[in-house]
Amino acid sequence: MDTGAIVHIDYDLYNVGSGDLIETTREDIAKEHEVFDESRTYEPMITVIGDGRLIGGFEAHLAEAETETEYTFDIEPTDAYGERDSSLVETISQNVLMRSVSDPNMLGIGAPVEIGGRNGVLQMLRAGRARIDYNHPLAGTALRYTYTIVKVVEGRSGRVATLLRMNTGRSDFEVEFEADDVTITLPDSIAYDQNWAYAKFSLVRALREHLEVGVVVFREVHTPRVAAEEEE
C-alpha cells in the first residue's frame, strides 16, 4: 500500500496473552465477544498510510498490505506501546490526588486519573498514599491484529472529504477545486465547534502533505434568517 494512501480498515485487536478482544470496528465481533456498546457506531477506521497515527508494528504491516485481503499477525510490545517502565509508577500523597480530581466519589482502583497533566491509572489508595501507573494501559502487552483494507479513497474531492471527516468527525462540507486550489464550504453549525480552530490548521497541513494542494479557502455562507409566519 502506497505511503499517503487514504484507506478504510476493518480490524479486530486482541491481547495475545489472554485472548481478550481489546478493540473492534465490527458490530458482529463485538457482540460475539459480549463487549457490544450501543452508544458507539461500528464502522471501518480511516487512516493515512505512513503518517504515524498508528503504532509502529501496524504501520509497517499496512505498508505491505493489499486491499480486500484479510491479515492476522502479532506485534511485540517493542513495536506497539513499549515495555512496562517501573519508573513510570509513582507514589503520591492522597491529598495531591484529591486536589487533582474533579469528583473524588468516582475514584476507584483501576480508575483513570490526571495528575499534573499526566494521565495514569490508580493502582493503590491506602494510609494516605496513592500509587499511580503512568504506563500506557497496553504497555508490555503483545497484540494480535486481524484486519482488512476494505476501501482505498480515490479522487481529489473524495480524499479531501475523507481528511475533513478524519479531522472533524463531520461529512457535511462542500468541496470544490480550481486547478490545485481548493475551496471548502463550511456547515453553519461548525461555528459552535470549539475544536474547529485547531482542526482547521491540522487539516491544512494534512491537505498540503497528502494532496499537494495550493491555496486552501474556507468559505462561510450566512443566509438571512426569515421569521416564521404566525399561524392564523
Describe each model-derived feature in a short phrase.
Residues M1-E232:
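FKBP-type peptidyl-prolyl cis-trans isomerases
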